[in-house]
From Swiss-Prot:
Protein name: Large ribosomal subunit protein uL16
Subunit description: Part of the 50S ribosomal subunit.
Protein task: Binds 23S rRNA and is also seen to make contacts with the A and possibly P site tRNAs.
GO molecular function: rRNA binding; structural constituent of ribosome; tRNA binding
Cross-referenced InterPro entries: Ribosomal_uL16, Ribosomal_uL16_bact-type, Ribosomal_uL16_CS, Ribosomal_uL16_dom, Ribosomal_uL16_sf
UniProt GO BP: translation
PROSITE patterns per record: RIBOSOMAL_L16_2
Gene it is expressed from: rplP
Keyword Cell wall biogenesis/degradation part of the UniProt annotation: no
SUPFAM superfamilies, A to Z: Ribosomal protein L16p/L10e
Family under the similarity heading: Belongs to the universal ribosomal protein uL16 family.
Taxonomic source organism: Sulfurovum sp. (strain NBC37-1)
Length: 141
């Protein structure tokens, strides 16, 4: 599971996820990638599930890059607990995703197989995504 080794503060405020992604919106390493079409939050477990499905589909050939890292703690109070008595404990780690953000990249795999693997990974995402290639990378959204 992806999570920071240490953070300055244990808990964060929720914040807002607005606007479009101006960082991490172009293919940097691979030939084909998954790009977010709408805003959402991705969990470390969802990233890991997508990574496992992709690597199994491509039979561990080629190279895959994970371009997102969950660095925001999400807290939750235990079930059947009354309100009050402080903020809950850290439940999981997430990252806010804005439209246009590249999530995974892949190289060294033939395009048909890469598309099949990335399609399986898209089904694990909690928001709409699309597959783009390096020549489409200049399109922002």
């Amino acid at each position: 599971m992806l999570m920071p080794k240490r953070t300055k503060w244990r808990k964060q405020q929720k914040g807002r996820n607005r606007g479009k992604s101006f960082r991490g919106n172009k293919i940097e390493f691979g030939d084909i990638a998954i790009k977010a079409v709408e805003a959402g939050r991705i969990d470390s477990r969802q990233i890991e599930a997508a990574r496992i499905t992709m690597t199994r589909k491509i039979n561990r050939t080629g190279k895959t890059w994970i371009r997102v890292f969950p660095d925001k703690p999400l807290t939750a109070k235990p079930l059947e607990t009354r309100m009050g008595k402080g903020k809950g404990a850290v439940d999981r780690w997430v990252m806010n995703i804005k439209p246009g953000r590249i999530i995974f990249e892949m190289a060294g795999v033939e395009e048909e197989l890469a598309r099949a693997a990335l399609t399986l990974a898209i089904h694990k995402m909690p928001f709409k995504c699309k597959i783009i290639t390096a020549k489409d990378s200049h399109e922002l959204y």
